[in-house]
Amino acid sequence: MPGKLRVHELAKQLGVTSKELLATLKEQGEFVKTASSTIEPPVIKKMRAHYEAKGGEDKAAEKNAPAATPASASKKPTEKKPATAAKPGPKPSAAPKPGAAPKPGGAPKPGGAPKPGATPKPGGAPKPGAQRKNTEKGSERAVTPRSMPKPGGTRRVANNPFSTGSSSDRPSPGPRPGGTKGQRSAGKPGDNRGGKGGARPQGDGNRSGGRRPSPAMMPSHPNPASMPSKAAGSGGGGRGRGGRGGGPGHGGPGHGGFRGRGGRRGGTAGAFGRPGGAPRRGKKSKRQKRHEFEEQQKHEVGGVRLPDGGGKVVRLRRGASLADFAEKIGADPAALVQALFNLGEMVTATASVSEDTLQLLGSEINYEVQVVSPEDEDRELLESFDLQFGEDEGGEEALEKRPPVVTVMGHVDHGKTRLLDTIRKTNEGAGEAGGITQGIGAYQTTVDLEDGPRTITFLDTPGHEAFTAMRARGAKSTDLAILVVAADDGVMPQTIEAINHAKAADIPVVVAVNKIDKPEASPDKIRGQLTEYGLVPEEYGGDTMFVDISAKNNINIDDLLEAVILTADAALELTANPDMDAQGSAIEAHLDRGRGPVATVIIQRGTLRIGDSIVVGDAHGRVRRMLDEFGNDVEEAGPSRPVQVQGLNGVPGAGDNLLVVEDDRVARQIAAQRDARKRSALQAKARKRVSLEDLDAVLKETSTLNLILKGDNAGSVEALEDALLDIEVDDEVQLNIIDRGVGAVTQTNVSLAAASDAIIIAFNVRAEGKATEEANAEGVDIRYYTVIYRAIEEVEAALKGMLKPIYEERDTGAAEIRALFKSSAVGTIAGCMVTEGKVKRNGKVRLVRDGNVITSDAKIESLRHEKDDANEINAGYECGMVLSYPDIQVGDIIQAYEEVEVPRD
């Protein structure tokens, strides 16, 4: 197969012009722009075959044309006799009359050059040298397009390359044989008179020879009696140029230049698939019927027609946009934007939309919108990578027993950390700021019991109310919970919250009644209080084990551990497959200055080894190093083992799932998709709904406190953020957390704070490097905290300080108008007697008449005692004053007051 060629090169090989070849390519469906465009080998082969077949047809047409075509054309005048027949046998020098039929045997003279518009006479083939060169080209252009096969058997209309219909139902006429109707005679050289019914070569070829006729050259109408009657469908006579063929069945005596009335014309197909001509009558097409049916089924919302869901369920991810919703239901996103605007919500098509907004729009068009939960969304993501989380691989024979994971929960300062210190024989609580736990600690301890050593994994969760989310994560990651309640304090709010977390996680609870060594301890009271919350002691006929202990004096600690083991063995089947790829949960994560991101994880199933590719939430990496709770290196970690993992590219969120994947590429893709979905969800959550009603209020200036949060671990930052966002002061001020992160305060944080006028809250971290110098230079305020509730209190105080002050009116005195004096310089002067307190110059006053307040914001513009100006007048003295309110009368009471700022609670 030949290589690629340009259009003009192939045209030269085929012996045609580039214009003709371009037209042929378009007819064949190959849309080529210019003659310099290249053509693929299959198209070249197709064009060669087309022109080879066309060449054979042209040769056959040339062979049959002199004999067949003129004979058939000259046969028509002989069938119908004219009213006045032409005389046969004209002189050789005389031109034939317009109505005379040519003789079949007549041939043109060898030396005679026919007119450009003349065609060969019947019976003789024209010689190649008898016509001029441009005439041959014009004839070739005129004949060639008609000899080409057209798609669909019709000719394209005018210059519309997309049309496939003809301009009329009649066939396009070919070149007429000369002499059939009023052929021009080779008259005198000076004879410019237009012939009667002169013919012209039909087609798209250029006009050759002859001058353009003028009105003086117009011939008079011929006598119809002297002309042969036309056959139906023949062309009318021409005035200087040939008439066009008339429609079939409507021929008549031709008048110069007018075409015969055609039959019913078919509509021409327009460009780009639009139907042309008059609309069709009759039955509608299936497409039209289906389109009309779909339009009728659409639901109108605020003037916008949208598809009616009919109660269908649409599942959308968190933070989905209107474009995602439109893709699900097959609608135009712009239509959804307009519909939501008509409902009072202003949202763009690509912005993340809240769940409430999506459900509101779905209910309007009869769709039930279900926002996929984070768990389902993550499961679908893992399934797309052929991964599963939460199931052991293999059969029951692959499962082995694993140690229980126990969470110690309870109210703040009830002794949870002291209990763990006693079990581990360490002093963990001494290192906590303020004596309260502000992170989750994970430890594994071996306990010597009567039946041998047993391993237990402990999780210590914070008890402060700000750490609700951390306690919930601790409950979800554990098998059993120890509820610590102080015997001298009783059930407290965080105690109840811990019970609810345990019930939600469906885990058994062992109650440790602590501090029984104190004189005011009352264990029976604790048992009675917990019975109200569903924790019934065994001695009361329930199924909850209660153990009275003293963590400080190491009383009954072994009994508590034995109760934990018994409960785990009786109520739980703790097994896992250690031979599969590791799966676990991140209990805590922080950014270490020397080691980078460090995540504390508990392996739930499988075994984690050095070098494994892991993904933890939106962080991924390869396990570079693992440490246990004592700082020792660990090569591999089995089920229920807590370890610190290094090697991640970022700090994961507390509670994120850990998963070992095939390679780093898969881990990176999963982490990237999780990060994108997380950002979309946060945008939808942070976006404030703006309705048309409160648009003016939103546009007004409001006081906003911008904060940047930095902490030592992800859980503390999350707890601090939730606690700060829960502060309710007033709608006049807003709290905006523009950034959050784990690790020391950096120069990037300071630059962002300077650009956004924000305050940096540093929790258990300090500024590093030149961040402090830059903060001092930029005037950025960095607040350092080690106890969370102090940060909450100061931020709340700052928000209250941003509130607009409230002013209270306090009366300072009163005066009665006794007389009025007119002055051209200052207006009306009120002669008054101060009856109470005192009045001051430029002070605010109320004007009271007959017990009604006439105005409440008047002002004393001038104050005099006799002829002297005075700043204030006390009770019992007369004075003259000029008020800013001129409509005053004798007997009016002037009440002076001042506005005093009132502190806001």
From Swiss-Prot:
Please list where the region (G5) is annotated. Answer: 550-552
- Composition skew (Basic and acidic residues), residue ranges: 50-62, 291-302
PROSITE patterns per the UniProt record, alphabetical? G_TR_2 (PS51722)
Record's compositionally biased regions (Pro residues): 89-125
Domain tr-type G: residue ranges = 401-575
Q: Which GO terms describe its cellular component?
A: cytosol
Q: Where is this region: G1?
A: 410-417
- Has UniProt tagged this entry with the keyword GTP-binding? yes
The segment annotated G3 runs over 460-463
Q: Do you know which SUPFAM superfamilies this protein is assigned to? A: Initiation factor IF2/eIF5b, domain 3, P-loop containing nucleoside triphosphate hydrolases, Translation proteins
**Chain intervals with Basic residues compositional bias:** 280-290
Q: What does this chain do? A: One of the essential components for the initiation of protein synthesis. Protects formylmethionyl-tRNA from spontaneous hydrolysis and promotes its binding to the 30S ribosomal subunits. Also involved in the hydrolysis of GTP during the formation of the 70S ribosomal complex.
What is the protein name for this chain? Translation initiation factor IF-2
Q: Which organism is it from?
A: Corynebacterium aurimucosum (strain ATCC 700975 / DSM 44827 / CIP 107346 / CN-1) (Corynebacterium nigricans)
